């Protein structure tokens, strides 16, 4: 997956289209990401014997990686990601501006 934790992304499809957020977690096995403050769902939880209170909590749900794009650090618009090898190390580069991301 080209998107990594702490990347700034924009949602390009679905009910949250056009919104930006930071990637909190990636799930490579399912090709999904969890973006801070986006795709919120309500979970009904039971109280646990350890003392956790039950109730309805709202939290972020996963979004498929094909529905998000990286935000270019230079102009704040969506960009694709290229992989470039320099001196034996691989880096991610924003295709829109050529800015190195790592």
Predicted region positions:
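Ribosome large-subunit tunnel/peptidyl-transferase-proximal elements
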Residues: 1-46, 56-60, 69-77, 83-102
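A cytosolic small-molecule/anion-sensing beta-strand core signal
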Residues: 66
């Amino acid at each position: 997956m080209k998107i990594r934790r702490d990347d700034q992304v924009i949602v390009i499809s679905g009910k949250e289209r056009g919104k930006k957020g930071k990637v909190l977690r990636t799930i490579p096995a399912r090709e999904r990401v969890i973006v801070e403050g986006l795709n919120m769902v309500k979970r009904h939880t039971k109280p646990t014997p350890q003392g956790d209170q039950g109730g309805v909590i709202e939290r972020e749900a996963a979004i498929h990686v094909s529905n998000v794009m990286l935000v270019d650090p230079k102009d704040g618009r969506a960009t694709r990601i290229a992989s470039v090898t320099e001196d034996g190390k691989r880096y991610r580069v924003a295709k829109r501006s050529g800015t190195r991301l790592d």
